[in-house]
Structure formats: structure tokens, C-alpha cells
């Protein structure tokens, strides 16, 4: 069984939530929050900030921990509330 952890954020900018358009092999897969896999030795909060920057170009800071989302295939995501500055 494969287990993976990813972290991301609910990013707020000027009162709006940042969503990313997910497209895989030219197929629309919906709108998603920015998130990605934790690298070895990386803290969850650092992963969230790095992934927001990599996927959206936004520099943000963490306001608070929001929660965890678990998926059936043994992965889970950790989300933080972030504001862009």
C-alpha cells in the first residue's frame, strides 16, 4: 500500500480564494487548491508555502492550520489558510 502526504493552502487574495485549473494530458479535471508532495525532511507548513509559490507564483504567509483531507487510496493532504502579500 502506497501512502503519501501532500500540503497546500486555501489562499485568500483581496477577498477571493485562489483556485488552479487542473489539466492533465489536455483533459480538464476541475478546479483545485494548490498543493503538492512533502519532500524528505521538509515541514508541512514549508511544503504548503513552497507549493503555493511553485504552482501559482504567489508569495504568501500562513495564518492558521485549516484541516486535513483523506483520500481512499491512502493519501492525505494538509491545508493552511494563507494570505498573499
Where are these regions (language model features)?
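Short amphipathic alpha-helical surface micro-motifs
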Residues: 1-2, 14-15, 45-47, 64-67, ...
Amino acid at each position: 500500500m502506497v501512502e503519501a502526504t501532500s500540503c497546500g493552502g486555501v489562499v485568500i487574495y483581496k477577498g477571493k480564494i485562489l483556485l488552479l485549473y487542473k489539466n492533465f494530458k489536455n483533459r480538464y479535471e476541475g478546479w483545485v487548491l494548490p498543493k503538492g508532495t512533502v519532500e524528505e525532511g521538509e515541514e508541512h507548513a514549508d511544503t504548503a508555502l513552497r507549493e503555493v509559490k511553485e504552482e501559482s507564483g504567489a508569495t504568501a504567509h500562513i495564518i492558521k492550520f485549516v484541516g486535513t483531507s483523506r483520500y481512499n487510496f491512502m493519501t492525505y493532504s494538509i491545508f493552511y489558510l494563507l494570505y498573499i502579500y
